[in-house]
Amino acid sequence: MKANELREKSVEELNTELLGLLREQFNLRMQAASGQLQQTHMVKQVRHNIARVKTLLTQKAGA
């Protein structure tokens, strides 16, 4: 997800997005641990998206 798309979302929407990303990260880690993960690059992408959302939440909390 692009940072511009995330900036347009409200705090509630960002929290929902964060929960979804954390669930996805958990599922990817479980797949990696069991050897079923085909697209290993997804772990890094999800981690970066989580960081983007958390950064925006921090910025919106300060503003």
UniProtKB/Swiss-Prot annotation:
InterPro entries: Ribosomal_protein_uL29, Ribosomal_uL29, Ribosomal_uL29_CS, Ribosomal_uL29_sf
CDD domains linked: Ribosomal_L29_HIP (cd00427)
GO biological process: one example: translation
Gene Ontology CC annotation, any one: cytosolic large ribosomal subunit
SUPFAM superfamilies referenced in this protein's UniProt entry, alphabetically: Ribosomal protein L29 (L29p) (SSF46561)
Keyword RNA-binding: no
Keywords recorded for this protein, A-Z: Ribonucleoprotein, Ribosomal protein
Molecular function as annotated in GO: structural constituent of ribosome
Taxonomy, superkingdom: Bacteria
Pfam families: Ribosomal_L29
Thylakoid found in the keyword field: no
PANTHER family (alphabetical): 60S RIBOSOMAL PROTEIN L35/50S RIBOSOMAL PROTEIN L29 (PTHR10916), LARGE RIBOSOMAL SUBUNIT PROTEIN UL29C (PTHR10916:SF0)
HAMAP family on file: Ribosomal_uL29 (MF_00374)
Similarity section: Belongs to the universal ribosomal protein uL29 family.
Identification of the protein by name: Large ribosomal subunit protein uL29
Source organism per UniProt: Pectobacterium atrosepticum (strain SCRI 1043 / ATCC BAA-672)
